[in-house]
């Protein structure tokens, strides 16, 4: 099975997952790695642990930054949040329609992983861009947080904020442009129109002027093909959120007029909202972008022993959701 469980005799982790990780019973709690000689070994962290060493060599990765939040205003139709930037060495496409990047070549040292949070939700006039996700050490990768949706504080007025993927433009002061995407990480946000805010850009496609968010990147590095870093839908449009965790826009006159947030650990953008005229609702607000994620897996065999104690410690503290066993959903570090 793909479930961690305890050895009843020694009280130590007996099986990590179905790929052949096994742990020896006894005081050491150590594990023989890659018993079945599979092609990839998955490694993941959820709650800031420090893990034992892994063998030097190639490591495939997916890095996704946090998505931007949507715009909000009492009189305009604001833009949606853009998806976070994406860089990956796995599959056929990286962010911004760039080719996949080379795998990391691990040298001896410590590598720190930081997961970017999504831009925060807001019932005021300011959208918030997402935060960067990074891998740092002897190798360095930085994905830029998604741009916030256009609002009355952006310059020129109503333009989407730049980011990994750009936020959608508002209809304030005409049809404001969407924000730009980071080269080789994501696309621009959609332009606002007379009837709606622009959709947020996604890592795989741009946002559109009808409020449709751009799709994210489709990647199966976790073992399940999933979209990441989709753009959100702009306010009041007929468009939908992009695939990859993007939130949807809301009319502030609806009850409640709260937009939908980007999905956690997807890097999706947050939806936009407004309070139009006599339909004002105190509950109306834009929503947050989704937090980012990092997924890594080591290619080929690992040599020697891999200490599983930290995995078990995370599990017993309730910090290791089974569904996320390949994912790094918070900050952490590993050594090589």
Feature locations, PLM:
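Alpha-helix initiation/capping motif
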Residues: 1-2, 129, 299, 324, ...
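Charged, alpha-helix-forming regions
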Residues: 1-51
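Intrinsically disordered, low-complexity regions enriched in polar/acidic and amide residues
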Residues: 3, 13, 23, 34, ...
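Low-complexity, glycine/proline-biased repetitive segments and flexible coils/loops
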Residues: 52-311, 320
């Amino acid at each position: 099975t793909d479930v961690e469980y305890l050895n009843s005799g020694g009280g130590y982790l007996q099986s990590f997952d179905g790929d052949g990780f096994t742990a020896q019973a006894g005081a050491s709690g150590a594990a023989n790695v890659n018993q079945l000689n599979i092609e990839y070994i998955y490694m993941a962290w959820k709650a800031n642990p420090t893990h034992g060493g892994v063998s030097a060599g190639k490591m495939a990765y997916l890095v996704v930054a946090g998505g931007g939040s949507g715009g909000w205003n009492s009189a305009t139709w604001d833009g949606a949040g853009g998806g976070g930037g994406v860089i990956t060495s796995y599959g056929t496409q990286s962010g911004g329609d760039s080719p996949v990047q080379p795998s990391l070549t691990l040298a001896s040292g410590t590598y720190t992983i930081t997961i970017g949070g999504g831009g925060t939700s807001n019932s005021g006039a300011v959208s918030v861009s997402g935060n960067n996700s990074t891998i740092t050490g002897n190798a360095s990768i930085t994905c830029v947080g998604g741009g916030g949706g256009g609002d009355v504080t952006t310059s020129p007025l109503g333009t989407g904020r730049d980011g990994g993927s750009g936020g959608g433009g508002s209809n304030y002061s005409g049809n404001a442009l969407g924000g730009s995407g980071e080269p080789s990480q994501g696309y621009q946000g959609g332009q606002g129109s007379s009837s709606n805010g622009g959709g947020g850009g996604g890592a795989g496609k741009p946002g559109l002027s009808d409020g449709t968010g751009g799709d994210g990147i489709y990647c199966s590095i976790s073992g399940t093909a999933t979209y990441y870093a989709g753009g959100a839908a702009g306010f009041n449009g007929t468009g939908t959120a992009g695939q990859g965790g993007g939130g949807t826009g809301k009319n502030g006159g609806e009850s409640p007029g709260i937009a939908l947030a980007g999905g956690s650990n997807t890097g999706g953008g947050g939806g936009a909202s407004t309070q139009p005229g006599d339909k004002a609702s105190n509950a109306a607000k834009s929503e947050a972008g989704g937090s980012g994620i990092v997924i890594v897996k080591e290619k080929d065999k690992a040599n020697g022993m891999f200490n599983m104690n930290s995995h078990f410690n995370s599990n017993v503290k309730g910090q290791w959701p089974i569904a996320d066993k390949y994912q790094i959903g918070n900050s952490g570090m590993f050594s090589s």
